[in-house]
UniProtKB/Swiss-Prot annotation:
SUPFAM superfamilies: Hypothetical protein c14orf129, hspc210, TPR-like
Protein name: Clustered mitochondria protein
GO CC annotation, single: cytoplasm
Positions annotated as TPR repeat: 1025-1058, 1067-1100, 1109-1142, 1151-1184, 1193-1226
Stretches with biased composition (Basic residues): 1-12
Sequence similarity: Belongs to the CLU family.
Classification lineage: Eukaryota, Viridiplantae, Streptophyta, Embryophyta, Tracheophyta
Chain's role: mRNA-binding protein involved in proper cytoplasmic distribution of mitochondria. Together with REC2, REC3 and FMT/CLU, contributes to the establishment of the cellular volume devoted to the chloroplast compartment.
Length: 1407
């Protein structure tokens, strides 16, 4: 951080890591106590209830969607008073004598005298550091361009304290007593700080750091429109424009360009600011304080040469090629560069003010930089012009890969381990420790990313250049790099040319070296196909190593350390980046090896002190202490995998490395090719909890003596099912269910049972070395018992977890939208992706899930093949190779010889394409300059065509996932969602234009715009905040809004301090805070929190991530709750666009969103549009889920309500009858929802009878007037013909429109299928004697021509009566819907599972 000059350079290295190179900006001060956290919004008057309230309260499932459920949460009016509003917060805080809860911070006002002499005020906490204050000042518009200053603190007594950067305020003075003030005093610049000042000035002048969200733009446009309408003389818009959702859902490829937000137009304030070629200052000028020279060209066209000194910036007299350091005649100078430019140029002053106003108008989170931004697979099309930018060129040329880095490099390992040694006994100490760890780890990942690109691009030389290339290792910026090569492709390429299909090439035989795992004596010949056993860091095991490292980091055992680690996939290569182990590069590491083995168990090292530390971690990770025998028949007691390496570094710390098998091997995969198929840690946790709960239940029943033991075993699968629900808290589409939902017990009972069984849970441990080649010690019974334990948990995965996961998918308890969320759901349940083939076979009957699994298998198989292509091509062929691959994958590219077939020439092409003639250990040789290109033709990748590629994909899927890809997979893959998935997995960015997937070659080389690395890392998470969120979710599910609000607020405050606002977990907190405020009736507060979540999701997850789509959907519902329906519909349109890109139009969440859109139009009275969306939702659910699924019943019920609002009570009764039939079949007669549906049917039937009776009464009342009117008309025959012509014309047009479906224009954005569906409904209604008017009027009997005259005469009276009747029906309907909100599901209120979300939770609540 460029703040001070020389005074803070000698601080502790461990502390400097928390603030060095700080790029994350706090958007606001840490959250105040709960009472003060509720946004201070104006009271909402006449706010209509949200869509969901007509049917049911809304609760918060784990993916953040609003879902209609029954009364799991009390009504808002019952709980709203428990959450303090903004106007109550001050008095409540003053009267609260209790200590602040964890994560809550008391803020105190402190005045600041700025460097320019102005005054401002900050809200500070005694625990804030001086660096925090500097960051606050850097964010404030008044002080944002001051970077080099000292801070002085004056207390109430007049004492002055100089603040060092790493001081906490509480260490210097007590600001809680008041009367304290801060003063910014100019400090002297040095070479580093003045360059940082110039860099800061450039950033301030650019809007590139402003990431505007579409939600913000929509809100600003809506407010502007409202203000315009409120002006005198302006007429308000009478209608809300209809969305084009149904249209673009049918043209997803055409909507790609809509995803990219239009970037903010740059406001030019200066032509350029560049470092002058007079730099560096000559020695005699250095002696008088010159540090830097800048060349500036203003918008007026004036050129200035500016001198930066230790004190000021001024314009010198240089005009040509000779430096004239004297100040110019104008004498302009200032303490900052921005201040000087404001004096030099009036246009700069105006533009700078506009830039600052633009940034100030944005949401604070939009100005915050994300530490690890996601990869964007779409780029602006047409590609914007690339303009000259001297400053950009300077920054690009300062990147150093191979040369010596300027200045002192960061010692990542020392920083990381020092942060881990921070004290963490008090909550505030834990926050500071977590913050330091997060910052160091994030900086490491960023540095590893740049270093890996340099390694793969051959910009960084290896440290062992004389070794074979497959063994090359690299060190750059104190980070160790090594390659991990995937040999799954070799399995395919070697099987075909050899024609020996009986011998399988091991999928785990992959080549690479990690730090300290190479044995050069056994690698003199890299051409040998057999692989050396101790080369462990293969493509697959790198993932396992990363997972093991995370587990030991979470265990956090004092005295046991792990290296920082990241995995970078780029251009087909997988690079493993690790912090450098102290002393490893200076000597032989075998001398320091104290634990584990470097030669696969031939020699095992053991140390008592090391074993004690490892054993402590093993108890937390369910690893059993067991015996292993080495080659010398010596028995060792280990509590870790044999191949792990315990090393004491030169810093005397105990490091544990190579943690590929922290969890036991999967007993379902025991072949030699599956030695790195291990179980996931989530599964181990779930199994241990299930086992301990079963034991505790058995003990309880034994104590009661009332049950036999057979019941216990019968409950095993139920216990497992319940635990799976609890584990899948990150990917489930419904709220996390406790085991009590499955066992008919209360949450308190489960908590008590969990505490009782925690001890037995910890006692469950597994031997990680069973089913391996290592020789195990102990007797045969013990070894058999260890193997049986692993077999038991493997069987638990196949027999309990997988069936339960498939069941959750089918019932929409878990509803993944794309490949990423499917993978997250699998992992959250403890299921490895290699089981995805079994999942696919289990969901064949559901088209959307079948396609999702099918496409994920296809994309994962294609990813490995594309990576193999990228590994073997040169830099200049990347764009054409990627476009050719996409054409073969999505198009129908054929080689010049015609259609390819599985003959010998094809096999030869395949062999050449995959490089099968190259030995496995030569993979990655493309990194060598010119080595590969000399041995293969220029366009070897052009030898493949669509048939060859798909044949390889099918074979890969069969070998890797044990799944036979059907021929249909080529057709189902022609989707934007598949293209998106593939691009994200490989790191490809393409142009955002419409692609014709029916063409043979849909892609061109110019469509490939970028190739970025894909990264996996071990950045720690804040476990305390995560636990608080889980507790808050439990409270929210039980309706305890005030308590849940407290938990979520505490978690939000902690995460803000640890990670800053740009983090996924912060978004989760904002989502749940929005849910709580929504339930409490504070719509404006809910929108404020939801807006935060949306911005964070866009920045941290991506513009088109499913969570981002759900955020837009929830935002729309909140806006609708404030009667801002136009803005709500715009957000719904964005949600549908994103859902179309991520999942495609065929997904139940899309149907649920259609229902929500229909409810909005229904509340606006646009019944024709509402019916179109409801009909389309019904068709989707019937096609995707079946005609008897509960979600289909939801659609029928929504249609029944819509027809009821139109007065078509007969149609309402018919649709509700279908709802009732489905619920009876799925839930039974006794279920509350079934009874509710029956009540609705009775209500609709009663209203139909009432309407008929009212109609007959009206006809009788008007009978007497009829004759009088006829007599009148007989006296005026000319009126009869006029009335007859007018009535016949109007009626004929209306009937034709209803039958033919011509009531909507056939234009852009109009869905003809929906129109035909709506027309069909009207046609059937007309056939039954009803005319359903598109305008939502009351249906009237289709009159024969002879009765037209009487109908015309009575039009006014009958319409009046019917209008009143219909109006009463609508009011009554709304009232009853509101009254029955707890039990009657009008429609799902969000993007999710809808009616089925919390079935068992609701049943429990009713019990």
């Amino acid at each position: 951080m460029a703040g001070k000059s020389n005074k803070s350079k000698a601080k502790r290295a461990a502390q400097s890591t928390t603030t060095n190179s700080t790029t994350d900006v706090k958007s606001d001060a840490p959250a105040p106590p709960v009472a003060a956290t509720v946004p201070a919004t104006a009271p909402v008057t006449a706010a209509a209830a949200p869509v969901a309230t007509a049917a049911a309260p809304v609760t918060a499932p784990d993916n953040g969607t609003l879902t209609a459920v029954d009364s799991a949460v009390p009504e808002a009016n019952e709980v709203a008073p428990t959450i303090p509003k903004a106007d109550e917060s001050e008095s409540q805080v003053e009267n609260n004598d209790a200590q602040p809860k964890q994560g809550e911070l008391r803020l105190y006002p402190v005045s600041v005298k700025t460097q320019s002499g102005g005054k401002m005020e900050l809200q500070l906490n005694p625990g804030d550091s001086v660096m925090d204050i500097r960051q606050f000042l850097l964010d404030a518009p008044e002080t944002c361009y001051f970077t080099c200053y000292e801070l002085l603190l004056r207390n109430k007594d007049g004492e002055t304290h100089h603040l060092e950067d790493y001081n906490e305020i509480s260490e210097v003075a007590d600001i809680t007593i008041g009367g304290c003030s801060l003063e910014m005093v100019a400090a002297l610049y040095d070479d580093r700080s003045i360059r940082a000042h110039v860099h800061r000035a450039r950033d301030l002048l650019s809007l590139s750091t402003l990431h505007s969200s579409l939600s913000t733009t929509l809100a600003l446009q809506y407010d502007a429109a409202l203000n315009k309408v409120q002006n005198p003389g302006d007429k308000p818009k009478s209608d809300v424009p209809e969305l084009e959702c149904l249209g673009f859902m049918e043209d997803v490829p055409g909507s790609l360009k809509k995803l990219i937000n239009s970037t903010s137009e740059e406001i030019r304030s200066v032509e350029n600011i560049v470092f002058s070629s007079f730099n560096p200052p000559p020695s005699h000028r250095r002696l008088v304080g010159d540090l830097i020279y800048l060349d500036v060209v203003t918008l007026e066209g004036n050129k200035y040469c500016i001198t930066g000194t230790t004190k000021t910036f001024y314009v010198n007299s240089s005009s040509g090629n000779i430096l004239d350091p004297r100040p110019s005649k104008s004498g302009f100078e200032a303490a900052t560069l921005i201040g000087l430019l404001q004096k030099l140029s009036s246009k700069f002053k105006k533009a700078f003010r506009e830039v600052m106003e633009k940034k100030a108008s944005a949401h604070p989170f939009e100005n915050v930089q994300s530490l690890l931004p996601p990869h964007s697979w779409l780029r602006t099309y047409p590609v914007p012009d690339h303009k000259r930018d001297a400053a950009r060129a300077e920054e690009a040329l300062t990147i150093s890969y191979g040369s010596e880095l300027i200045g002192m490099q960061r010692d990542w390992n020392e920083e990381l381990q020092s942060c881990r040694e921070f004290p963490h006994t008090s909550p505030q100490e834990r926050i500071l420790r977590d913050r330091a760890l997060y910052k160091v780890s994030s900086d490491f990942v960023d540095a590893a990313l740049n270093g890996a690109i340099g390694v793969i691009s051959r910009c960084i030389p290896p440290i062992n250049p004389t070794d074979p290339e497959c063994l090359h290792m690299y060190v750059h910026n104190n980070i160790f790099f090594s390659f991990a090569v995937d040999a799954d492709i070799e399995q395919l390429s070697k099987k075909r040319p050899s024609n020996q299909m009986t011998e399988k090439v091991s999928s785990s035989e992959k080549v690479s070296c990690t730090e300290g795992t190479c044995d050069n004596e056994e690698h003199n010949n890299c051409n040998e196909a057999p692989l050396v056993e101790n080369e462990q860091a293969t493509y697959a095991s790198a993932n396992n190593d990363l997972k093991g490292t995370k587990l030991y980091q979470e265990a956090d055992v004092p005295g046991l350390y792990n290296l920082a680690m990241a995995i970078i996939d780029y251009r087909g290569h997988r690079v493993v980046a690790q912090s450098v182990l102290p002393g490893i590069l200076q000597g032989d590491k075998s001398d320091a090896l104290l634990y584990g083995s470097v030669d696969n168990g031939k020699k095992i090292c053991w140390n008592e002190d090391f074993h004690a530390k490892v054993l402590e971690a093993a108890k937390l990770l369910h690893i059993k202490e067991h015996s292993v025998i080495d080659a010398s028949e010596t028995v060792f007691k280990l509590a870790a995998p044999v191949e792990c390496k315990g090393i004491v570094g030169s810093d005397n710390r105990h490091y544990l490395l190579d943690l590929m098998r922290v969890t036991p091997r999967d007993a379902n995969y025991t072949g030699p090719e599956s030695r790195f198929c291990v179980l996931r840690p989530e599964l181990i946790t779930s199994f241990c909890q299930a086992e301990s709960l079963e034991k505790s239940k058995f003990k309880t029943k034994a104590d009661e003596g009332g049950d036999d033991s057979s019941n216990v075993s019968a409950d095993t699968s139920k216990v497992g099912d319940a635990l799976i629900d609890g584990e899948a808290n990150g990917a489930s589409n419904s709220d996390q269910k406790s085991i009590s939902d499955k066992q008919n017990t209360t949450a308190e009972d489960y908590a008590a049972g969990s505490s009782e069984s925690s001890k037995s849970c910890d006692q469950i441990a597994f031997n990680p070395n069973v089913f391996t080649d290592f020789t195990l010690g102990g007797n045969q019974e013990e070894i058999a018992a260890d193997e049986e334990n692993v077999k038991k948990v493997s069987s638990y995965l196949v027999d309990v977890v997988l069936p339960k996961f498939i069941e959750d998918l089918c019932t929409l308890e878990v509803s993944p939208m794309d490949g990423q969320t499917l993978t997250e759901a699998l992992h959250a349940h403890g299921v490895n992706v290699r089981y995805i083939g079994r999942v696919a076979n289990g969901v064949k009957h559901l088209p959307h899930l079948w396609d999702l699994c099918l496409n994920e298998i296809t994309v994962r198989s294609a990813k490995h093949i594309l990576k193999d292509i990228l590994r073997d091509i040169e830099d200049h062929d990347i764009g054409s190779a990627v476009s050719h691959f996409l054409n073969c994958f999505f198009g129908n590219y054929q080689t010049a010889g015609g259609k390819a077939s599985a003959n010998s020439s094809t096999a030869k092409n395949q062999k050449k394409f995959f490089g099968a003639d190259q030995p496995i250990t030569k993979k990655g040789q493309g990194r060598g300059k010119g080595k590969a290109s000399s041995k293969k033709s220029f366009s070897s990748y052009m030898m493949v065509d669509s048939n060859i590629l798909w044949s390889d994909i099918q074979e890969f899927a069969k070998a890797k996932y044990e799944f036979e890809l059907p021929e249909l997979s080529r057709t189902t893959a022609k989707k934007v969602s598949v293209l998106r998935n593939l691009c994200q997995k490989v790191g490809v960015s393409i142009a955002a234009r419409k692609y014709d997937f029916s063409a043979n070659t849909p892609f061109e080389t110019s469509d490939i715009l970028d190739l970025r690395p894909v990264i996996k890392h071990s950045v720690p998470v804040c476990s305390e905040a995560k636990d608080l969120v889980e507790m808050g979710k439990v409270q929210l599910a039980e309706g305890m809004l005030s308590e849940s609000y407290t938990f979520f607020s505490e978690a939000f405050s902690i995460l803000q301090q640890v990670t800053g606002p740009m983090h996924r977990e912060v978004a989760n907190c904002c989502r749940y805070l929005a849910m709580v405020l929504y339930h409490a009736g504070d719509m404006a507060g809910a929108i404020m929190q939801q807006h935060k979540e949306l911005i964070i999701n866009e920045r941290c997850l991506g513009l088109d991530h499913p969570d981002t789509a759900h955020s837009y959907g929830n935002m729309a519902l909140f806006y609708h709750g404030l009667n801002q329906t136009e803005l709500a519909l715009q957000n719904m349109g964005r949600a549908l666009l994103l859902l179309g890109l991520s999942s495609g139009p065929d997904h139940p969440d899309v149907a649920a969103t259609f229902i929500n859109v229909a409810m909005m139009y229904q509340d606006m009275g646009k019944m024709d549009t509402a019916l179109r969306y409801l009909q389309e939702a019904l068709k989707k659910n019937e096609r995707l889920l079946g005609p008897e699924h509960i979600q289909t019943a939801v659609c029928y019920h929504a249609l029944a309500i819509a027809f009821n609002c139109m007065g078509a009570f007969k149609l309402s009764h018919q649709h509700e009858k279908k709802t009732y039939d489905i619920l009876v079949k799925q839930l039974g007669d006794d279920d509350s929802r079934t009874r509710d549906s029956l009540n609705w049917m009775k209500t609709f039937k009663m209203r139909e009878l009432q309407m008929t009776a009212q109609k007959q009464k009206g006809q009788a009342a008007n009978a007497a007037n009829t004759q009088k009117a006829i007599d009148l008309l007989k006296a005026h025959p000319d009126l009869i013909h006029a009335f007859q012509n007018a009535a016949a014309t109007g009626r004929t047009n209306a009937l034709n429109s209803a039958v033919l479906g011509e009531t909507q224009p056939r234009g852009r954005g109009f869905d003809e299928r929906a129109a035909r569906a709506a027309a069909e409904v009207r046609k059937k209604a007309a056939a039954k004697g009803l005319l359903v008017r598109p305008q939502g009027g009351v249906p009237v009997q289709a009159m024969p021509p002879l009765s037209q005259l009487q109908n015309m005469i009575n039009t006014a009276t009958v319409s009046s009566e019917k209008g009143g009747e219909n109006g009463e029906a609508k009011v009554q309907e709304k009232k009853e819907s509101s009254e029955n909100g707890k039990t009657e599901n009008l429609a799902p209120a969000g993007l999710g599972a809808g009616l089925t979300s919390l079935d068992k939770k609701k049943q429990k609540a009713k019990k």
